Amino acid sequence: MEVTVMTQSAVSVEHTKDTTDLFILKHKDLDVAMMKMDVRTGMIEYILSVYLPEELPAGCAPDGTGLGEWWKLRAIPDSRQGIRQVLSRLSEATSQSLMLSSYGLSLADHYWIQPVGQELYWKDLNFYENDFGDELGDILTDSERERSVSDGISKLSPSVSVNGDMKKKWIIRGGRRYLLKVNPSYHSQQAVNEVIAGKLHERLGWKNYVSYEVGTIHISGRKYPCSLSPMFTSVETEFVSAYQIVAAYKVPNDVSLYEALIQQAVSLGADEKEVRAFLEYMILTDFILTNTDRHLNNFGFIYDPRQHRLSGMAPLFDTGNSLFYDYDVIPHGGNLLDIPVNSFSKREADQLHYVKSDAGVKLERLVHFPEEAEALLREYTDMTDERAAETARTIEEKIEYLNLFFQGKKIWKKERYW
């Protein structure tokens, strides 16, 4: 489908940064902390006072330590292609200062910052209940449409508080919020990989995942595939990343990061059985798809801010960096057991150490799944048919390796030691 976005009437209040360098961190309408900020760079310089330690973002100490890192991770990373040019065009020094123009509002949680001396309210600003314009999102994804000079560019957008290297923006379609992601490089495969992951979860009967669809976006006069996924937070719930759970925790030398995360999550209200089942399923399905980028900000928990506890696992999302999208030569055979990843382990196969059950990954349900993935790659990307077939073959091989693993083979070792 082709993405067409109706221009929404944006929230009318936009922050001007020439009034004060003192800001209040807000959680909806609660005053959480007072901060001094560098309004040019958008960076938090120091915390003046913490009023409600229990309302601080997860991962921050009661005295506010960690707020600076939390704020930085909320912004568009410097590593995102084209962000320097966007900032220059908008006369912003950093992506943090761009975020400051939008009060730090997000569609992941209910935090924002209020300039001291201004009387503002959550109900009037938040992007859950208030529409927002699309022009800044267009710039961030290189998908600008013809606009009148008089239209201007509103910086008040949730698109400025979405991290990750892939270009993305929030859009409104039929009253619902969707995250659109695009990368014209690598055959635009990342967008299609998200849909393939959804087909995998569907076959396995797994319910807790974000459903992606493939759309089309115009960039420099050409059409490219993009992915569209609905928002999974709400005015009642927030997303807390796994990284936030362990950010302020010193992991003992005799405890793995995997176990430390589970322990910390349980201490914050999560159900241990649910967490373990989710993580094992995630490791197994990421293995099938060779998802190399399941770092601690790419999965997490749903947080209930009223009860101050984790209420469950956030749905699985962000499987775009998989299926050898950025490999020139696709590996096969034993080389598939030596894949470097950015996750609990440095090597993909080593993560199977943590898996104690099949976690609902019934391999017999995946008959013809490789062919389904191949068909999607052929339909939506411009890769050759040969590469699509070769990519699908890695799925077949990974399923065969998991079958051996379920039979008790220690496939992370050299084959002679299985």
Provide a role label for each language-model segment.
Residues 291-292:
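Glycine-rich phosphate-binding P-loop
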Residues 295-300:
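Canonical protein kinase catalytic loop motif
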Residues 1-284, 288, 301-418:
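Phosphate/dinucleotide-binding and metal-coordinating scaffold of catalytic cores
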